[in-house]
């Protein structure tokens, strides 16, 4: 997005991370009121096409560039944060069965907590971004269908022409048809994870 001014296509993730981190520190130093906590998450791929992640963390005094562990052999949560973190983490402990540690299980839990969260600063419509391995892909926004209504990046979508080229998912993490708002006929059924009794 910087049109080659700071980053180049041949840079490794670590080089990009250091440049971005230093630019954030430089820009932040111009603010007079900067004693609050700030966290900025950065996820990308290295030259081996493996995901890397960092959090750029301002603790009110100094900046830190902290690496997030990403070397997993199966779907895992990289982090949870924000005012809804505690409820999400507690809620996820109750989501278990054959779907445990699957991508859809994390999404089921996320949709459930967004709908039923007690924290007044958390809520709204789930927003979904896909990060894919392979040289042809970068981050891609996906649409979500909640209670028969389509949303894209959290915004309600009417019957807008051209939205069929976006991949749509319902709360079950099933691929849906943009026109019908229903699960596509050939899409895999993704049953909701059963909650364990407390």
Labelled PLM ranges:
Residues 1-198:
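N-terminal nucleophile
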């Amino acid at each position: 997005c910087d049109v080659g001014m700071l980053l180049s296509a041949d840079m490794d993730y670590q080089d990009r991370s250091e440049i971005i981190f230093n630019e954030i520190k430089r820009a932040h130093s111009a603010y007079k009121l900067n004693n609050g906590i700030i966290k900025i998450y950065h996820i990308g791929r290295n030259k081996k096409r493996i995901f890397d992640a960092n959090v750029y963390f301002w603790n009110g005094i100094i900046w830190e560039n902290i690496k997030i562990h990403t070397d997993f052999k199966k779907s895992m949560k990289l982090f949870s944060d924000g005012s809804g973190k505690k409820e999400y983490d507690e809620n996820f402990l109750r989501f278990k069965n054959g779907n445990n540690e699957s991508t859809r299980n994390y999404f089921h839990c996320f949709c459930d907590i967004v709908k039923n969260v007690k924290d007044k600063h958390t809520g709204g419509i789930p927003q979904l971004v896909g990060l894919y391995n392979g040289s042809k892909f970068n981050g891609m926004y996906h649409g979500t269908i909640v209670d028969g209504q389509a949303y894209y990046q959290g915004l309600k979508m009417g019957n807008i022409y051209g939205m069929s080229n976006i991949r749509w998912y319902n709360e079950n993490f099933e691929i849906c048809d943009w026109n019908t708002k229903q699960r596509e006929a050939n899409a895999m059924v993704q049953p909701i994870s059963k909650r364990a009794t407390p």
